[in-house]
Amino acid sequence: MSARAAAAKNTAMEETAIWEQHTVTLHRAPGFGFGIAISGGRDNPHFQSGETSIVISDVLKGGPAEGQLQENDRVAMVNGVSMDNVEHAFAVQQLRKSGKNAKITIRRKKKVQIPVSRPDPEPVSENEDSYDEEVHDPRSSRGGLVSRRSEKSWARDRSASRERSLSPRSDRRSVASSQPPKPTKVTLVKSRKNEEYGLRLASHIFVKEISQDSLAARDGNIQEGDVVLKINGTVTENMSLTDAKTLIERSKGKLKMVVQRDERATLLNVPDLSDSIHSANASERDDISEIQSLASDHSGRSHDRPPRHSRSRSPDQRSEPSDHSRHSPQQPSSGSLRSREEERISKPGAVSTPVKHADDHTHKTVEEVVVERNEKQAPSLPEPKPVYAQVGQPDVDLPVSPSDGVLPNSTHEDGILRPSMKLVKFRKGDSVGLRLAGGNDVGIFVAGVLEDSPAAKEGLEEGDQILRVNNVDFTNIIREEAVLFLLDLPKGEEVTILAQKKKDVYRRIVESDVGDSFYIRTHFEYEKESPYGLSFNKGEVFRVVDTLYNGKLGSWLAIRIGKNHKEVERGIIPNKNRAEQLASVQYTLPKTAGGDRADFWRFRGLRSSKRNLRKSREDLSAQPVQTKFPAYERVVLREAGFLRPVTIFGPIADVAREKLAREEPDIYQIAKSEPRDAGTDQRSSGIIRLHTIKQIIDQDKHALLDVTPNAVDRLNYAQWYPIVVFLNPDSKQGVKTMRMRLCPESRKSARKLYERSHKLRKNNHHLFTTTINLNSMNDGWYGALKEAIQQQQNQLVWVSEGKADGATSDDLDLHDDRLSYLSAPGSEYSMYSTDSRHTSDYEDTDTEGGAYTDQELDETLNDEVGTPPESAITRSSEPVREDSSGMHHENQTYPPYSPQAQPQPIHRIDSPGFKTASQQKAEASSPVPYLSPETNPASSTSAVNHNVTLTNVRLEGPTPAPSTSYSPQADSLRTPSTEAAHIMLRDQEPSLPSHVEPAKVYRKDPYPEEMMRQNHVLKQPAVGHPGQRPDKEPNLSYESQPPYVEKQANRDLEQPTYRYDSSSYTDQFSRNYDHRLRYEERIPTYEEQWSYYDDKQPYQPRPSLDNQHPRDLDSRQHPEESSERGSYPRFEEPAPLSYDSRPRYDQPPRTSTLRHEEQPTPGYDMHNRYRPEAQSYSSAGPKASEPKQYFDQYPRSYEQVPSQGFSSKAGHYEPLHGAAVVPPLIPASQHKPEVLPSNTKPLPPPPTLTEEEEDPAMKPQSVLTRVKMFENKRSASLENKKDENHTAGFKPPEVASKPPGAPIIGPKPTPQNQFSEHDKTLYRIPEPQKPQMKPPEDIVRSNHYDPEEDEEYYRKQLSYFDRRSFENKPSTHIPAGHLSEPAKPVHSQNQTNFSSYSSKGKSPEADAPDRSFGEKRYEPVQATPPPPPLPSQYAQPSQPGTSSSLALHTHAKGAHGEGNSISLDFQNSLVSKPDPPPSQNKPATFRPPNREDTVQSTFYPQKSFPDKAPVNGAEQTQKTVTPAYNRFTPKPYTSSARPFERKFESPKFNHNLLPSETAHKPDLSSKAPASPKTLAKAHSRAQPPEFDSGVETFSIHADKPKYQMNNLSTVPKAIPVSPSAVEEDEDEDGHTVVATARGVFNNNGGVLSSIETGVSIIIPQGAIPEGVEQEIYFKVCRDNSILPPLDKEKGETLLSPLVMCGPHGLKFLKPVELRLPHCASMTPDGWSFALKSSDSSSGDPKTWQNKCLPGDPNYLVGANCVSVLIDHF
């Protein structure tokens, strides 16, 4: 203070001395150090004044401080550490340890002229102020301002003004002293040292400057110079500037200030501190420090760079985008980035880049560069060292020539850099002799020089920054490029290197491990090759931080950028060259599978038929988009400076476009399409010219485009970055309902549109910027669509760093075909109103009006999904065919790439550890198989080929291949062409190929990538089969027979086998996929139900069953035939049954659930597809190769026989099951003689035994688990049936050893459904071997229907399920169990459908389960609950597939009838689960003999693993069962549900949800004899048995099921709540009801909440029909028994309470919001939430559906709670 006092001694009255504050960054120079000497300190006061300040006593000439610091400057801070009242040694130490750079804040006396002399206090206050400011300045400028700026652009202005105000702070002090009317000069001299001045100083905050056009300027109530007395009610007296800034920042958009006018403007008359305003101008070094805070981290940096930067900036626009991208990404990994940035700050080079902020665009060049680095590294880093920034800046300013950039920098930096620069010339010898460090973010440095090399002799040394080599600028080049450039120089060539000595910067770079930093977007799919690698799908963004990982070429170290641009995980990815190679292989390999030649012949053969042609086109369109992007696209995060075009995909995309353009013409305009030039394309489709889009954009409107995915990719390439919205359909029926309501005149096929949507999603989901789940019950999608478009428009976009080739040209005529126009299927619409039009949404080739030429297959085919052509074919066949084609194309052209990319995320998460990259790839291609089945009739070969390609990669077993070959013939779906099919099939046949296919299937089908991944991992094999490949695969595995059988059956029942198969497959796929997929779960259910219905009615379902059945058998048979196949088929078979209890095939042929029943194969296939994947995953865990095989065969098994699929699984691990399966076959044979033989083959006793023996393997797959579940369900009724069937059909299974085709046909029609049920039961039974004994029971049951038996059977299934869960818990079994559990529900579904279809012993039993399930299912369908079932599937896959994902499980307890259970679990581990499935198998074995005991025993283990294991199984099962069966099952089932009620009553049911499942099973067995009603309950519950607690709730529901059915039929009636609904759960031993809330609501809505638990249900007005008083309740439970199946392998953990909502079956006209508290604090980053909901009437865990939370508008994950929109209980 003495200094300040001294300052007051101004000689002239009008002249006053003030203390200016400056912040300077010094760079240590060799021989100079910082070039300053300091004196003073607490222990060394001034000899005269006694001042203890640290004072600059000397500044060396030519040193770093010259021109920046002056003698007598008071040092206020060094590197943010206050130097006030410190000892001299401390100050010296701070300078020494500051390394290469020191940020020094000094106070300098300055004389100013003031109208009135100022009193002494003012200077004092000034000083204090300045000190205050100093403290603030460093902090704020360093961290606060910068980080703020980066975080919010709006803060930029404020921060700038703040910064200015910072320096004014010193001025502020004058305010404090402004009280005296006139400035007065005061001099106080101490007579002795210890004398005090007696002053108490205060500071004021005042308005230093108001920026133009700001809020404050417009308001006019604040003027510059006003003293701020209060900020938002807080008094500012003695408040530091930093605190004031913080207060303002926390104002959250509303700032209240109390200010006092300074009429005399005393404060304003104080000259600006150079610090504040100058820094902003970057006119002074000091200012630089200030600017640094303003612009970003380093004012110095920004200052130095601005000039230079402006120069370089323009050339290198990348920096700016980079800045942006860095900005957001940096936030993600703020920790590492920050530390890195700080280090950088210490180093000039590193710091400079990080310093700049995108927000500081004002500093244009310099700042941009800095920002770029900053963002990359850590925008939060407040201030990199200015000098370093300069050093780094040249790096940033790549565009500018190095010398230019460098020289300006050096001049800016006191010319320190200039003298250190050197120009070295020498001739290259064998090598340049240099090792390089650094990268594009900090500059390229010499890390080592070879002794005696020419470079060493010329004076290059370690630590030199290379600015230029041979006129090539090295300032912004990545390290890998720099190394390659030097390596590529020819020997003997003269090398000219411009370098600069920056050893200190170099050291910092080495210490902080910084170098490269740039962002890339991937355009291919990759499976990590090492534990440290990162797998990725298309469209993912990474920040690359080291392009020469470990000093070797080939790998890059990268950080994955997740949601909200946060950095999620770091790992190794291939370098650019390898990526290009992998991408090219990915694009061509699939083609080889199909083969260009094969395609040519295939399409040529199709020319005669327009329909076929359309199919072929669809095939191609289903393929992933062929992109023009490189494997890695350099991107930056930027705002869209224009209204982005909007592309809408989905079944009602045409309606959405027209509605937007009609209702909001000022915002949206449809881009008109033009006919293509003659000869360009024979297709009738039109094109949209980029010029047309540009005209609309120029009008400030969104251009609505009706284009194909390929066109979207081209738009992205042209940097138009369209907003791509995918309207995700809930179900086929939902699509039909919506289109009837929205566009009744439309002639488009809802089925085709639905299937096309699935294919599109599978192949091109990476193109979607947002997805909206459609609810057929309302038109909420429209508001969500507009909101999504607005949100996307306002979001930052990852855009290409460079310009696209020709993208800038207006006409974009570079590639007339690609850039000058976009294919517009919509335009085709106008020309053709045929069904094919629906494809317009997705594909160019969608129209089939024009003559077909081979050319048509070009890119447009890839774009469009070739489903429309199939419309002509029967529904079942059409779907299959479509899927097949689309899928196939994907596989073929680009299966690995697109499908892989889509599925891979799922793969990636679980599959990396679990499977090989190839496997994953195979999985990725799996979706193609899916399509392939669809296309099967027309282009099955291509589909198969794709599968094959994938298969080749993954499957090991060639044996399956032969079978696969058969598949192409028998099942065109499987293989588009026989040749391709054979090749493909062979590869496919091995477990791995199958695996591959499933992945693809998943990708295409599942909407949520996460879920997809999970599916892949957990049940990739199964998925492949059930999903896409199932049709193909199963056929492939036992292809020749099963396909044939299926085809024959199809032909007999439906249409040509091709069509039927194809259709079936497609349906399956879409449905299955849907179910599995995140949201589609519900929708698929819905569709499946309808589908089944239709199938049943037409009797086609039977054929489907036949086909499927044979497949199933085949699959078993196949496993027997070949070890590879044998093991695989088991997996395969269980998977199909597992999920739906029926093979997926049936369902696909019949897109409707009914079909599923009748044709369990298609329906189950669909479901199973997902399940199988999960199962296969489990299996994979235990034995990678076998699981792969299983996958391959499994999918086939699925396709061949959904029921069988289960059987196969059963067979896999249960000989008994095999026998049991046979009995179902026998019933089938009854329907059809062929069925029996088919069954015999597929279900030979030996395979069953083998399966049983292989139980563990199966269990790992999770398919096994599912099978167990189904077994439990069926054990009572089904097992008896099975016994009968077994007896009759056991021999047929033996026959099954023969080619599956013939035998399959026989059993397929009816037996398949029965078989499905049986299979499920059998599978469960086989798990334990006791089931063998059980099969007789099943047989008996099949002969007669007994509700008790049904209940018992369901109970058994439950117990199996529980057991499985238990087994899963202990080991890898968990995944299997999970899957198995879902299978149970599926089985129930099959049963239900089957029952409906045929009145066999099984049928009754199936009916019982179906009732409970069906009811629930039905409701979900109506309410669009089917999607939740899908989530279940999805969740299940996700569990297996995702290493860590949060699963929020919503469990609607159908049986309970009380409501939904929702739980949140986190998935973490993937591979560990496979082992538990084997355990599960054993429990399953126990189960058949003594279900109750088994259940109990397993129950406890389940409890130990309840969350994970049960969750998985339950999820999948529930999804499948609930959606399809519930919907279909008629009221009779409801009565069945009542028996469930009894079941729930049973204590075991009550206590287990997951464990309870186990309990349930025992309950069933014990209660079945004791109380038929109870058994019935259990049976009904069997599908959802996984959650015992749910079951309890269901007991109440048992009564409710009827209501449910009624409810479905008549919404207006209130659904009664049975007293037991609320009470029973509590009574149950298995779970504890923590809280119960109930209330009566009417049309006005309301809130039902539980304060203790934080759970609440918000019922909006209009959710309940008018005139209805509806009682609603929910119970919050803590019960392992009813927990959703958590996938331990995925590391799922329950994060939220389990909530059971009721009454079950209640549907809302508007979605109600269920809020669940959760503890997933890490959710936003690496964790993934999965919502698991059970819609089963029984509340079975098996019916847990996975609902996708991320990105789903129906689910909102907050910091402490998850909000879920549900439309039914």
From Swiss-Prot:
The gene is TJP1. The modification Phosphoserine is found at residues 125, 174, 177-178, 211, 240, 274, 276, 279, 283, 289, 293, 296, 299, 322, 328, 333, 336, 352, 616, 621, 809, 820, 823, 827, 836, 911, 967, 1070, 1138, 1365, 1412, 1546, 1618. TJP1, TJP2, and TJP3 are closely related scaffolding proteins that link tight junction (TJ) transmembrane proteins such as claudins, junctional adhesion molecules, and occludin to the actin cytoskeleton. Forms a multistranded TJP1/ZO1 condensate which elongates to form a tight junction belt, the belt is anchored at the apical cell membrane via interaction with PATJ. The tight junction acts to limit movement of substances through the paracellular space and as a boundary between the compositionally distinct apical and basolateral plasma membrane domains of epithelial and endothelial cells. The modification Phosphothreonine is found at residues 184, 266, 353, 808, 845, 847, 853, 860, 867. Residues 1635-1769 form the ZU5 domain. Residues 148-174, 298-326, 878-891, 1108-1124, 1273-1286, 1335-1346, 1402-1419, 1539-1548 have a biased composition (Basic and acidic residues). Phosphorylated at tyrosine redidues in response to epidermal growth factor (EGF). This response is dependent on an intact actin microfilament system. Dephosphorylated by PTPRJ. This is Tight junction protein 1. Homodimer. Forms heterodimers TJP3. Forms a heterodimer (via PDZ2 domain) with TJP2/ZO2 (via PDZ2 domain). Interacts with OCLN. Interacts with CALM, claudins, CGN/cingulin, CXADR, GJA12, GJD3 and UBN1. Interacts (via ZU5 domain) with CDC42BPB and MYZAP. Interacts (via PDZ domain) with GJA1. Interacts (via PDZ domains) with ANKRD2. Interacts with POPDC1 (via the C-terminus cytoplasmic tail). Interacts with HSPA4. Interacts with KIRREL1. Interacts with DLL1. Interacts with USP53 (via the C-terminal region). Residues 102-188, 295-362, 824-976, 1010-1067, 1091-1212, 1224-1261, 1273-1589 are annotated as: Disordered. The 244-aa domain between residues 633 and 876 is the primary occludin (OCLN)-binding site and is required for stable association with the tight junction. The modification Phosphotyrosine is found at residues 131, 821, 1139, 1164, 1353. Residues 892-905 have a biased composition (Low complexity). It comes from the Eukaryota. Residues 1150-1370 are annotated as: Actin-binding region (ABR). Residues 123-135 have a biased composition (Acidic residues). GO terms for biological process: ameloblast differentiation; bicellular tight junction assembly; cell-cell adhesion; cell-cell junction organization; cellular response to calcium ion; establishment of endothelial intestinal barrier; positive regulation of blood-brain barrier permeability; protein localization to cell-cell junction. It is a peripheral membrane protein.
